Amino acid sequence: MVPVIALVGRPNVGKSTMFNRLTRTRDAIVGDLSGLTRDRQYGEAKWQGRSYILIDTGGISGDEHGMDEKMAEQSLLAIEEADVVLFLVDARAGYTAADQMIGEHLRKRNKRSYVVANKIDNIDENLARAEFSPMGLGDAIPVAGAHGRGISQMLEIALREFPKDEDELEEGEVEEVAEGQEAKRIPGPSEKDGIKIAIIGRPNVGKSTLVNRMLGEDRVIVYDEPGTTRDSIYIPFERNEEKYTLIDTAGVRKRGKIHEEVEKFSVVKTLQAIKDANVVIFVMDAREGVVDHDLNLLGFALEAGRALVIALNKWDGMTPGERDFVKIELERRLFFVDFADIHFISALHGTGVGNLYQSVQNSFKSAVTRWPTSRLTQILEDAVSEHAPPMVGSRRIKLRYAHLGGANPPLIVIHGNQVEKVPKSYVRYLENTYRRVLKLVGTPIRIEFKGGENPYEGNKNTLTDRQVNKKRRMMSHHKKADKKRRDKR
């Protein structure tokens, strides 16, 4: 499970600055989803091979009423959702009554909480630690969020009990496929727990109904118990002798209950389900068409690089004209996930639900297959031969060879010269070429460029004495010849 870190504290202690710094390497993927997050902002970040979800909360002033009312509702929810709470205080302003009240609340919640003394510039760190020691939450971690000072130490402390990502592939870790061998699947979770499938979507689009339908007749359910964290449920089951694990974020329900209930949407559970899954089934309400919240949620899956299958639910009962309009909208607005299979289903009646499994299998296979360097390089050479990279100044971008850099999603590393100047349109061309030739379906593909160093850069020509003398004689000869030509004129 991906750990969740919440930033809490009173106003103007630097929470948003800290949030922006921590999510800078990977763009924040959620920013105040209207009607869903309100005062909370969610982001995804990674530090030394560990992914985590970051929550930025509104400030807590604590200047009136009791603590339960002073603590904003959204900040309370963020604390409940979090595995770790980073309690930011202002080292310049010192220990305040609001800090004391927030600290007391955190102690009562028995959360893993750390005091972070921000704005430590030009302040004695030992004095800052002593200033905030009365809160009883351990020594304060001194940082300067605006300048990045102390951030590594803070993250080391916050994440030290969490393992590195299971699918983290360091450079060179992917084994090479021998020449002449066929592409192979990288051994993954399917061999043990089955393909992990996360079913996500907006509230009330039919996720609960689809979950129950997939776990219904002709399925072998091993067990159905609530997960230990934030009510997510991991349900192993089998279908046609294939193993799967369904990650259900909609909460506990009776197996025989098919009708849809109003679901409480949780950004954290959705993000965690996506990160923990091998394949995401994204459910949309066909009768409502494509809405902005759908695009935001699809952005989660795309950012995480997960294989994707799209299910248009409630397809039954729509007129041919309505269906045609929805298909046009899908083509127009979902162009950025055009690699995903789209299924038109009725979770309530079961129409088309069985077809989802083949797309899940195909998507997972595409996401974890590996190819030899020779194969990827040949595809690159053919692509360049058919459509060469553009000229940059008087020189053409050169792409030399390619190799596999990771899986789930496939990462293809291309080496060459001036690669930092490759335009986005050409990157898209290469992505489409690899997708077409390798017959990839249902998975995003990522391309990373690495420039080659010039081995002669910085070297100067060193002439021998003989070469120097010859150069002088030639220059003298040319000067005499030029003088004769001028005299004749």
From Swiss-Prot:
Residues 369-453 form the KH-like domain. GTP 2 binds at residues 201-208, 248-252, 313-316. GO terms for molecular function: GTP binding; ribosome binding. GTP 1 binds at residues 9-16, 56-60, 118-121. InterPro entries: G_ENGA, GTP-bd, GTPase_Der, KH_dom-like, KH_dom-like_a/b, P-loop_NTPase, Small_GTP-bd. Residues 3-166, 195-368 form the EngA-type G domain. SUPFAM superfamilies: P-loop containing nucleoside triphosphate hydrolases. The keyword Chaperone does not apply. Residues 469-489 have a biased composition (Basic residues). One of its GO terms (biological process) is ribosome biogenesis. Keywords: GTP-binding, Nucleotide-binding, Repeat, Ribosome biogenesis. Residues 451-489 are annotated as: Disordered. Pfam families: KH_dom-like (PF14714), MMR_HSR1 (PF01926). GTPase that plays an essential role in the late steps of ribosome biogenesis. Associates with the 50S ribosomal subunit. PANTHER family: GTPASE DER (PTHR43834:SF6). Belongs to the TRAFAC class TrmE-Era-EngA-EngB-Septin-like GTPase superfamily. EngA (Der) GTPase family. This is GTPase Der. It comes from Pseudomonas syringae pv. tomato (strain ATCC BAA-871 / DC3000). The lineage of its organism: Bacteria, Pseudomonadati, Pseudomonadota, Gammaproteobacteria, Pseudomonadales.
